[in-house]
Amino acid sequence: MKNVDCTVLVASCDKYADLLAPFVALFRKYWSACPFQLALVTESDPGVEGFDRTIACGKGGTWCSRLVQALDAIETPYVLMLCDDYYLERAVDTALLLRRLEQMKKYSALNLRMIPNPEPSEKNSLAFAADGSLREYVKRTAYCVATQTGFWDCAFLRRLAAKTASIWEFERYGSYDFTDEEESRPILVTREKEFPFLDAVHKGAWETWGVKCLKENKLDFDFSKRGLPSFSTRLKEAVKRFIWKLNPELVTRLQNRFALGAKERKG
């Protein structure tokens, strides 16, 4: 019987359907004892075996609208949300994750992130007295809300998703959007990376470590769908990272104020 408190929710779309067979193969290899239902939310059913459930929302929606539909269909109060390119690279510590889920409930957390990204600092986080292995992100700081791997309170996640369209807007605007009730509830982050995944794709192109992971696990991948990023793309991304690191808070607030930054493309 699957855990009744949490669902693993994988967010995808038709453009990234080629990532799903490797995703689920690695997931089942490295987390064969996963106690949670594995649900996929996407546009069209990709016909990939290995998911316990597929929520096909149809064409014409956005990343956020599909997320809202999925959360309305899911009956558990929490989700462990993953993107479709979060490929497992070694075995998951199930006992550790179950302990983190219990902490979500115990501390009434909005989110418990299992990778310290953005890196916790004295400016964006606080010590969490109840558990020294955790820190608490300061609300209304850049990317205190982010789609890095973690447990989410479904009601909080749905409220934010209902107000935005793209994954990037969800993170940027959501980091500054909290109700009075949510103000007293923590956003927690582990000091170490506790979910052993790699981000296999960036800006629609394979990362070299993503391809290496597939080759090492003898998994097929379709290079006709996406290749490695060009030099110009890598240079552009490096410049953007450099600018962002100069003052993350200022850059994010300017993006929100003037509707800058990445936007979702339909079709």
Predicted regions and their residues:
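Membrane-proximal basic amphipathic "stem/tether" segments
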Residues: 3-4, 11, 218-267
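A structural signal for short, well-ordered beta-strand segments and their strand-loop junctions
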Residues: 39-40, 79-81, 110-115, 151, ...
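Short beta-strand-to-loop acidic/aromatic patch adjacent to the donor-nucleotide binding site
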Residues: 77-87
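Catalytic core and acceptor-binding pocket of nucleotide-sugar-dependent glycosyltransferases
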Residues: 144-208
